[in-house]
């Protein structure tokens, strides 16, 4: 099937992307169309190959997608890019040995896409993680092209009320894969809790941008009560309930902080999809989300 994106449609169960040149051409075209970095798109494609293997594996009901890859799927690659895959595991241990066995099983799921996965390293996440977790580094090989992948896997996340079935639209194919994912309210609640509790020490500008873009595109679908409950559940899990009533003061402090303003300017310059967004516009979206959260108290 030639012409546009349908060129890559799975035909008779076999993948039509057979060579590195084909894949690079498709990535290059998508890069131009979406004004997105081709290297990042290549990583996204390989992360999709891993996601599809999850969806066909015995662990498909234990893996729950979250983080940047989920946000990018919700808003579009032209509005958010990501380099890594984040997931939480339920009903399974999260230690190095168990995750190594789990990953090894997933990457051997037979799919005729020509992609081979190699586990490079696996270790406990020691940085400022909200939940205990494991970091997996892999490389993928497709027709001689090697692409690095990083996957962060956590456990014990507070998902309110529960994970949802998500139809993940593939980047280069006219089809979707069904996976478990965070619901929108939990995605936003985690980011809001991080902004409130870390105040001006939160240098992750993507948290601020994600709230803005998700609120813009999906704000009308949010359930205030679920959002409120998700924020409380996240704060309880992270031991930060006492900070929630300081939210308004924190927003003022963050908005007026010169370092935060400079960090936002740097983020705007780095990512074209954020280039037109002023800092006060971002902070207004965060305040609106918190007001919606407070509405949920009385529901």
Please name every model-derived segment:
Residues 2-63, 72-81, 85-299:
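Structured mid-to-C-terminal alpha-helical surface segments
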């Amino acid at each position: 099937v030639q012409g546009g994106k349908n060129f890559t449609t799975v035909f008779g169960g076999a993948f039509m992307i057979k060579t590195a040149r084909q894949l690079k051409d498709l990535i290059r075209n998508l890069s131009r169309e979406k004004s997105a970095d081709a290297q990042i798109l290549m990583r996204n494609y390989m992360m999709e190959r891993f996601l599809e293997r999850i969806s066909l594996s015995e662990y498909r009901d234990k893996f729950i997608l979250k983080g940047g890859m989920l946000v990018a799927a919700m808003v579009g690659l032209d509005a958010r890019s990501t380099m890594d895959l984040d997931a939480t595991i339920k009903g399974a241990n999260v230690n190095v040995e168990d995750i190594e066995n789990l990953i090894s099983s997933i990457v051997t799921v037979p799919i005729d896409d020509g992609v081979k996965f190699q586990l490079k390293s696996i270790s406990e996440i020691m940085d400022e993680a909200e939940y205990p977790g494991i970091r997996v580094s892999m490389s993928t090989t497709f027709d001689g092209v090697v692409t690095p992948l990083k996957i962060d896997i956590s456990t014990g996340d507070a998902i309110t009320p529960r994970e949802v079935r998500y139809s993940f639209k593939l980047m280069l194919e006219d089809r979707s894969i069904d996976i478990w994912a965070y619901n929108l309210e939990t995605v936003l609640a985690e980011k809001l809790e991080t902004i409130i509790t870390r105040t001006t020490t939160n240098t992750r500008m993507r948290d601020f941008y994600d709230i803005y873009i998700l609120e813009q595109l999906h704000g009308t679908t949010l359930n205030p009560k679920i959002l409120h409950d998700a924020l409380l559940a996240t704060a309880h899990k992270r031991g930060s309930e006492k900070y929630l009533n300081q939210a308004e003061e924190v927003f003022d402090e963050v908005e007026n902080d010169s370092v935060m303003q400079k960090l936002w300017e740097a983020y705007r310059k780095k990512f074209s999809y954020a280039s037109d967004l002023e800092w006060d516009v971002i902070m207004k979206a965060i305040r609106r989300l918190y007001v919606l959260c407070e509405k949920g108290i009385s529901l």
